[in-house]
């Protein structure tokens, strides 16, 4: 697992790319510039790891486009020490970004193969989420709720009610909503029953899988 000067140079180019696309949060840009994305991908994609593109990983999932990771992270407005629920651990790349932003990360993954692989991999790289769970993302992780922030890294036709209920008052939930194409949506909890909703452009995500059993 090598991270060379060449990789680091390509990462700085990637930072410039996402900056040009409108990302301004210096902490988020710092995380993108710091995390060895090529190590989160199949070695056959290594040469392309710092292109601003999504790539396939195990279990028919993808590692999100860096701009998308940065965009969602910026919308969350994470402060150090906040409890963040991540729905869809995936490759662990977004998890690593959240860890570097100082969040206490609680992450859930539906695909067992991916969950096992990513769990051992993150600790090898030195990223320490508070809790990684295998289970149904639609249900969140209620035993550690409420959360300051919630990020969903797969598309859902609508926001799962269980996730809204696990958000603190004043908290922010970022989720791509839609079926074929998703609209990035930010919910801010104003009170026990009231949420503000803001929409930010079209994105494409793999679907959030629900456990039908």
UniProtKB/Swiss-Prot annotation:
One of its GO terms (molecular function) is protein-L-isoaspartate (D-aspartate) O-methyltransferase activity. It catalyses: [protein]-L-isoaspartate + S-adenosyl-L-methionine = [protein]-L-isoaspartate alpha-methyl ester + S-adenosyl-L-homocysteine. Gene3D superfamilies: Vaccinia Virus protein VP39 (3.40.50.150). It is an enzyme of class 2 (transferase). InterPro entries: PCMT (IPR000682), SAM-dependent_MTases_sf (IPR029063). CDD domains: AdoMet_MTases. One of its GO terms (cellular component) is cytoplasm. It is found in: Cytoplasm. One of its GO terms (biological process) is protein repair. Signal peptide: none annotated. Its EC number is 2.1.1.77. The active site is at residue 64. The keyword Transcription does not apply. It comes from the Bacteria. Coiled coil: none annotated. Its main location: cytoplasm. Keywords: Cytoplasm, Methyltransferase, S-adenosyl-L-methionine, Transferase. PANTHER family: PROTEIN-L-ISOASPARTATE O-METHYLTRANSFERASE, PROTEIN-L-ISOASPARTATE(D-ASPARTATE) O-METHYLTRANSFERASE. Catalyzes the methyl esterification of L-isoaspartyl residues in peptides and proteins that result from spontaneous decomposition of normal L-aspartyl and L-asparaginyl residues. It plays a role in the repair and/or degradation of damaged proteins. NCBIfam families: pimt, PRK00312.1. Belongs to the methyltransferase superfamily. L-isoaspartyl/D-aspartyl protein methyltransferase family. This is Protein-L-isoaspartate O-methyltransferase. The gene is pcm.
């Amino acid at each position: 697992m090598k991270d060379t000067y060449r990789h680091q140079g390509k990462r700085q180019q990637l930072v410039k790319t996402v900056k040009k696309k409108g990302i301004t949060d210096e902490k988020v840009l710092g995380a993108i510039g710091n995390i060895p994305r090529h190590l989160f991908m199949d070695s056959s994609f290594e040469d392309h790891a710092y292109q601003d593109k999504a790539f396939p990983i195990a279990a028919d999932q993808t590692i999100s486009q860096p701009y998308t990771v940065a965009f969602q992270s910026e919308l969350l407005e994470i402060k150090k020490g906040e409890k963040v629920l991540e729905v869809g651990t995936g490759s662990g790349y977004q998890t690593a970004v959240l860890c570097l932003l100082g969040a206490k990360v609680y992450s859930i993954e539906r695909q067992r193969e991916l969950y096992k692989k990513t769990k051992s991999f993150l600790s090898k790289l030195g990223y320490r989420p508070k809790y990684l769970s295998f289970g149904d993302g639609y249900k969140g992780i209620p035993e550690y709720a409420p959360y300051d922030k919630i990020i969903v890294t797969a598309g859902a036709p609508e926001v799962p009610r269980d996730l809204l209920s696990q958000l603190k008052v004043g908290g922010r939930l970022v989720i791509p909503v839609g079926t074929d194409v998703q609209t990035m949506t930010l919910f801010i909890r104003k009170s026990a029953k009231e949420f503000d909703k803001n929409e930010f452009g079209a994105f494409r995500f793999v679907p959030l899988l629900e456990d039908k059993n």
